From Swiss-Prot:
Function: Involved in cell division and chromosome segregation.
One biological process term in Gene Ontology: cell division
Protein name: Probable cell division protein WhiA
Keyword Cell division: yes
GO molecular function, one term: DNA binding
One Pfam family from the record: HTH_WhiA
Gene3D superfamilies per UniProt: Homing endonucleases (3.10.28.10)
Amino acid sequence: MALTASVKEELSRLDIKKSSVRKAEVSAMLRFAGGLHIISGRIVIEAEVDLASTARRLRAAIAEVYGHQSEIIVVSAGGLRRASRYVVRVVRDGEALARQTGLLDGRGRPVRGLPSAVVNGSAADAEAVWRGAFLAHGSLTEPGRSSSLEVTCPGPESALALVGAARRLDIQAKAREVRGVDRVVIRDGDTIAALLTRMGAHDALMVWEERRMRKEVRATANRLANFDDANLRRSAQAAVAAGARVDRALEILGDDVPDHLKYAGELRVAHKQASLDELGRLADPVMTKDAIAGRIRRLLAMADKRALDLGIPGTDANVTPEMLDE
């Protein structure tokens, strides 16, 4: 699955309980994916997204948080449209929902940015704004020299609101206009990783980080002359770096780490140059490569989230240039 789709699928499964956070996410999704239309004298809201799971999440939130019914319309692929699109449409209660979510102000005028209640909300609300905006119109490219996380915005006001939400999370994002389209872009790898964590895309983050580490190690290895086994060296470097991150994760979490994650982490630390296959065989009972990798991913994600909450360095703090250069 492409990185963008994997992030959106994971975010669509995220279980959020707090009402204000769900409202912030819905407001952002409708702002960045939606539009207001007048049909037969009624205000109708339509939000077009690229995944069925995103459409289902939005429809459920509209019903559970605001009590309004909506329908999902599938626009099949064809012509210039390479993939199916999904339109969430609210007809009967369109005007009420538009006012509740801040698409319209108290006088019934369209709001171009985000409602003040969302803009001035908590850090969790800011995370929800980014989650909703990314689900609506976000993309994540492969890590590398041109890697980026970006959101296409309906206008400069919403772009500035999204930059402001990022700033409340101590994340630097830039608003740009490219060929008449407003976008908010993040290019720094560490900043992308921090935002994925704040949005709740922990599994996708681990995939992205693994690919990022692999590319960094590969770039370093390619500069080494007359080395007969570059692939083995890259794997060993990546394993050592992963071991250092796990070591830091165990330090951050202390006694709060679940036993099964702690066991996988201790295996990684004890055998820093072993492959995932080898780690699985060393486990008792024996584990598959995917099982050991999944536990390590969850351990690192949990530690990085804790580090963000505490304002301390995350698991990358233990990865030194020497681990990649040797």
